[in-house]
């Protein structure tokens, strides 16, 4: 037992003790009286600043990035109006770099291999969208599925992009080219063929092609025009840095109104498609193909349920449940969401790049005339598109030289040991980059030169690991073949119907970042 060397005897009375005790209480009271609301607020603010910095230091670890974070907001202002050269500086700073905006910690991968690792790590990451996306696309939209559910849903869409399916969409695609090229010529003539901006027209053309391909003629020309005009607001609402709430007259508010309009139009189209296909109509668009697959699955399941004999040939390649009009609209909306900005950017660059290189435009024109045997009105077919080797090379080089989507945000689902020494924390955003891979001099010599021949006489086709334009892994772009065929057909048809020139400005080669990349002016 421990010995206690002490006494329980009360200390002797000491007249000096009591006044000292009262003096301390008075001091505490004075401090509390001086501790105003504003002082308390300032104390909390400085404590929050310190916490924010310490959290940033912890998450940053050995990653390349700013030594300190601007309290709370980080580089928010730069994120609101992103500049391409700022992204380029990040890529050049290291294989992995970081930044923190408000509560979001962001890791940016700059090399091909690091980007591919992220794309191919579904156990650790999933595609990341801004908070408002759930309100615009619908909280139960398939794009928010993950893992097995996502894989199974995609299987039901794969049949919409087979060679035979794509062939059935060509007539409505060519119809759009013919209509809009006639309009382009009339518009240019009305302006006395003077230089003018054409990006809005290219956006509308691509929107029209997408809508006609997705929903055929179930939608009016006026509705397509409305979607083309308003889709810009959806893009603005889905920028990475934006308000997570829908407040009146904000980008999110305007974007929600536009998305509701698109979903209503697509829902009406779905009802019409169901009636058309149930009556034995032919497939003319993606919606028709998907509705028919659903109806075929329903017929097969009904026979099985009744115990009727069914030939193996009658079983659909992938059994689908029946989707409501709204569910079909949501899915088709995601196809528009995935394609509109990217194809608009590619279309704009394509027209500008070939205009700046008349020899390239002339080769495209010669090839398209030759494969049509001199008949510029020969209808598009898959076989015809297959013969356009040079036109395809121009499209592939455009996508490499100016990849529409330069980065793809992912959310870290659980701590991600991306290297032996770096683990990205759960909840962080991690971004594989496309641009550095498509401008890697080891894969593409003189990467900053536009050279379509690298896809014919060079070995660019062998650099598949670097061509990350459509992603890779479980979330690769479903419509990558369709997107490229669309661009090949579009520029080929344009070369036969029109001639065009580009009046360069000092900023023509500068890059504007708005969801995708466009020429600055």
Swiss-Prot record:
Catalytic activity from the UniProt record: 5-dehydroepisterol + NADPH + O2 + H(+) = ergosta-5,7,22,24(28)-tetraen-3beta-ol + NADP(+) + 2 H2O
EC number(s) reported in the record: 1.14.19.41
Molecular function GO terms recorded: C-22 sterol desaturase (NADPH) activity; heme binding; iron ion binding; monooxygenase activity; oxidoreductase activity
Membrane topology classification: Single-pass membrane protein
Name of a matching Pfam family: p450
Transmembrane segments: 30-50
Subcellular location: Endoplasmic reticulum membrane
Pathway: Steroid metabolism; ergosterol biosynthesis
InterPro entries: Cyt_P450, Cyt_P450_CS, Cyt_P450_E_grp-I, Cyt_P450_sf
GO biological process: ergosterol biosynthetic process
A cellular component annotation (GO) from this entry: endoplasmic reticulum membrane
Principal subcellular localisation of the protein: endoplasmic reticulum
Cofactor requirements of the protein: heme
Keywords: Endoplasmic reticulum, Heme, Iron, Lipid biosynthesis, Lipid metabolism, Membrane, Metal-binding, Monooxygenase, Oxidoreductase, Steroid biosynthesis, Steroid metabolism, Sterol biosynthesis, Sterol metabolism, Transmembrane, Transmembrane helix
Keyword Mitochondrion: no
Keyword Iron applies: yes
Function, as annotated: The third module or late pathway involves the ergosterol synthesis itself through consecutive reactions that mainly occur in the endoplasmic reticulum (ER) membrane. Firstly, the squalene synthase erg9 catalyzes the condensation of 2 farnesyl pyrophosphate moieties to form squalene, which is the precursor of all steroids.
Other comments on record: In Aspergillus, the biosynthesis pathway of the sterol precursors leading to the prevalent sterol ergosterol differs from yeast. The ring system of lanosterol in S.cerevisiae is firstly demethylised in three enzymatic steps leading to the intermediate zymosterol and secondly a methyl group is added to zymosterol by the sterol 24-C-methyltransferase to form fecosterol. In Aspergillus, lanosterol is firstly transmethylated by the sterol 24-C-methyltransferase leading to the intermediate eburicol and secondly demethylated in three steps to form fecosterol.
Protein family: Belongs to the cytochrome P450 family.
Protein name: C-22 sterol desaturase erg5
């Amino acid at each position: 037992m421990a010995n206690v060397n002490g006494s329980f005897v009360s200390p002797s009375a000491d007249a000096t003790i009591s006044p000292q005790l009262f003096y301390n209480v008075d001091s505490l009271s004075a401090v509390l009286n001086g501790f105003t609301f504003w002082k308390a607020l300032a104390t909390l603010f400085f404590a929050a600043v310190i916490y924010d910095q310490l959290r940033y230091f912890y998450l940053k670890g050995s990653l390349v990035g700013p030594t300190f974070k601007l309290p709370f907001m980080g580089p928010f202002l730069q994120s609101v109006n992103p500049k391409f050269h700022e992204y380029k500086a990040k890529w050049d700073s290291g294989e992995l770099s970081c930044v923190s905006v408000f509560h979001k910690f962001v890791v940016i991968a700059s090399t091909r291999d690091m980007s591919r690792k992220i794309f191919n790590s579904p156990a650790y990451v999933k595609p990341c969208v801004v908070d408002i996306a759930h309100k615009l696309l619908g909280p139960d939209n398939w794009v928010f599925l993950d893992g097995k559910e996502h894989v199974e849903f995609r299987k039901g869409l794969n049949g919409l992009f087979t060679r035979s399916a794509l062939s059935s969409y060509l007539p409505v695609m060519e119809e759009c080219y013919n209509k809009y090229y006639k309009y382009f010529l009339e518009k240019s003539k009305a302006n006395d063929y003077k230089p003018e901006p054409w990006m809005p027209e290219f956006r509308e053309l691509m929107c029209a092609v997408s809508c006609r391909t997705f929903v055929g003629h179930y939608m009016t020309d006026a509705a397509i025009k409305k979607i083309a005009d308003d889709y810009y607001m959806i893009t603005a609402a889905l920028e990475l840095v934006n308000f997570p709430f829908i407040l009146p007259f904000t980008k999110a508010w305007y974007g929600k109104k536009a998305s509701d309009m698109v979903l209503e139009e697509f829902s009406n189209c779905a009802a019409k498609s169901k009636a058309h296909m149930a009556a034995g109509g032919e497939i003319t668009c993606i919606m028709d193909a998907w509705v028919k697959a659903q109806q075929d699955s329903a017929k097969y399941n009904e026979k099985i349920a009744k115990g009727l004999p069914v030939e193996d040939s009658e079983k659909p390649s992938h059994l689908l449940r029946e989707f409501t009009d709204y569910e079909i609209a949501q899915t088709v909306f995601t196809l528009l969401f995935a394609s509109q900005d990217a194809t608009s950017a590619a279309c704009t660059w394509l027209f500008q790049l070939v205009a700046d290189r008349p020899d390239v435009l002339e080769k495209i024109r010669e090839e398209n005339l030759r494969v049509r045997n001199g008949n510029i009105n020969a209808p598009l077919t898959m076989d015809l598109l297959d013969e356009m080797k040079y036109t395809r090379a121009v499209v592939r080089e455009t996508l490499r030289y100016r990849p529409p989507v330069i980065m793809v945000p992912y959310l870290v689902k659980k701590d991600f040991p991306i290297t032996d020494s770096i683990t990205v924390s759960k909840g962080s955003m991690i971004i594989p980059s496309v641009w550095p891979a498509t401008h890697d001099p080891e894969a593409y010599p003189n990467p900053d030169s536009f050279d379509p021949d690298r896809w014919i006489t060079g070995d660019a086709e062998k650099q598949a690991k670097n061509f990350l334009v459509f992603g890779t892994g479980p979330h690769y772009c479903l419509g990558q073949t369709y997107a490229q065929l669309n661009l090949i057909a579009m520029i080929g048809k344009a070369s036969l119907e029109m001639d065009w020139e580009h009046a360069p400005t000092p900023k023509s080669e500068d890059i504007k970042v708005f969801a995708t990349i466009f020429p600055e002016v």
